[in-house]
Amino acid sequence: MDRSPLFLIIMGAPGSGKGTQSKLLASQLSLLHISSGDLLRGAVSKDTPLSQEIKSYLDQGKLLPDTLVWKLVHEKLDEFQQDTLLRRLSFLSRSENSAILDGFPRTVTQAKLLHEFLSSYFPNYKVILLDISDEEVLNRLTSRYICPACQGIYNEQQGFSSCPKCSVELIRRSDDTLEVILDRIQTYKQETQPVLDYYTEKQKLITIDANAPTQQVFQSILDSLSASLVYQERDCCNCDCDDED
């Protein structure tokens, strides 16, 4: 029986629902949600050699090198992996040793670095692609509102003027304009297709239709992960289910 923990990577175009689905999966499956965006924002607020190196690039308006982004993500993954080993020695369930990574990798170089790490500790990891049309991306992002306090995302159809969770007035992101969105879509396609090709070759990719409503997309992901979840349930019961005829 394969007892390796569940590790998921979630990818998709801007507006595909990566953050929303990551949070739903983290809650439903007891996964640690690792967001590269959160890691970057956290690093910038600190005073460490790594954060200073990151700030030097950002202050100059330069893109962070693959190796530097990997340092940031690897630091968190290494911490998680060490904690996972301790939890597994305590015979905790698989779900308590599992995680979902959002916002990384963005390049083939990053994907290769990540694959090398995961192959050693989480060999059965999967990559979830939220596949969404350009039209749906435009529809979602041009009608999107953000809570500046909790980062909750809402749309015009919901009719909220303030966040229902923390009562803060909702705002529009400055980059949610048609011109910027079209540019982001094009950049995403150029950068991401080689990464998707890489994961397809590695037989890691699970493609989900993300044009559907949130809960329908979520259920599609769960259905696609059913084999992994069956392993999880069997690990938890510690029985000899495989010995049955």
UniProtKB/Swiss-Prot annotation:
Keyword terms of this UniProt record: ATP-binding, Cytoplasm, Kinase, Metal-binding, Nucleotide biosynthesis, Nucleotide-binding, Transferase, Zinc
Binding site for ATP: 15-20, 144, 153-154, 212
UniProt cross-references to PROSITE patterns, sorted A to Z: ADENYLATE_KINASE
Binding site for Zn(2+): 147, 150, 163, 166
GO molecular function: adenylate kinase activity; ATP binding; metal ion binding
Renumbered residue ranges of the record's region NMP: 35-64
Residues covered by region (LID): 143-176
Pfam families: ADK
Reaction(s) the record says it catalyses: AMP + ATP = 2 ADP
Localization per record: Cytoplasm
EC number: 2.7.4.3
Domain of life: Bacteria
Cited SUPFAM superfamilies: P-loop containing nucleoside triphosphate hydrolases (SSF52540), Rubredoxin-like (SSF57802)
Pathway the protein acts in: Purine metabolism; AMP biosynthesis via salvage pathway; AMP from ADP: step 1/1
Gene Ontology biological process terms in this record: AMP salvage
CDD domains given in the database record: ADK
Binding site for AMP: 36, 41, 62-64, 103-106, 110, 173, 184
Cellular component, GO annotation: cytoplasm
UniProt domain comment: Consists of three domains, a large central CORE domain and two small peripheral domains, NMPbind and LID, which undergo movements during catalysis. The LID domain closes over the site of phosphoryl transfer upon ATP binding. Assembling and dissambling the active center during each catalytic cycle provides an effective means to prevent ATP hydrolysis. Some bacteria have evolved a zinc-coordinating structure that stabilizes the LID domain.
Family, as annotated: Belongs to the adenylate kinase family.
Job of this protein: Catalyzes the reversible transfer of the terminal phosphate group between ATP and AMP. Plays an important role in cellular energy homeostasis and in adenine nucleotide metabolism.
Subunit structure comment from the entry: Monomer.
Protein name (record): Adenylate kinase
Gene source species: Chlamydia trachomatis serovar L2 (strain ATCC VR-902B / DSM 19102 / 434/Bu)
Lineage: Bacteria, Pseudomonadati, Chlamydiota, Chlamydiia, Chlamydiales
